[in-house]
Curated annotation (Swiss-Prot):
NCBIfam families on file: PRK00521.2-5 (NF001802), rbfA (TIGR00082)
Glycosyltransferase in keyword set: no
UniProt-recorded name of the protein: Ribosome-binding factor A
Pfam families given in the database record: RBFA
Length: 139
């Protein structure tokens, strides 16, 4: 029997449950089911949720649309964690409602950083030499 390793990714069940929880959180936030002035003023995206192996902890990566007011939004989500957990429990049929944690989604920042790197003069110079060779059918 194979032992799980540190590099092993989430199981198919973890991924499936994470997607259900993500949809439930996004639905609650988009419908405005939580009575919070900060949350009602922002459109919040939930691009990813990661589940613990025992499915008792869900880490939701969230970002207000436009990237504005991240700290107040995260604080509001933390304040409303219990109510949000109850709403998720109503929508997702699990033995235990997962405890919710909220983290800032950094994928957009990382993508922008990579884009800046690819557009840098040094990289363009390196790519320029390869593109000349690749574009020449006789080379």
């Amino acid at each position: 029997m194979r032992k799980p390793t540190e590099t092993a990714g989430p199981s198919q069940r973890q991924q499936r449950v994470a997607e259900l929880v993500r949809h439930a959180i996004a639905e609650v936030l988009s419908r405005g089911d939580l009575q919070d002035p900060v949350l009602s003023r922002h459109v919040i995206t939930v691009p990813e949720v990661r589940m613990s192996p025992d499915l008792k902890l869900a880490t939701a990566y969230v970002m207000p649309l436009g990237g504005q007011d991240e700290a107040p939004v995260l604080e509001a989500l933390e304040r409303n964690r219990k109510a949000l957990r109850q709403e998720v429990a109503r929508r997702v049929n699990l033995k235990f409602a997962p405890e919710l944690r909220f983290r800032r989604d950094e994928t957009f920042d990382e993508a922008a950083r990579i884009d800046r790197l690819l557009r840098s003069e040094k990289v363009q110079r390196d790519l320029g030499g390869e593109q000349d060779d690749a574009g020449d059918p006789d080379a």
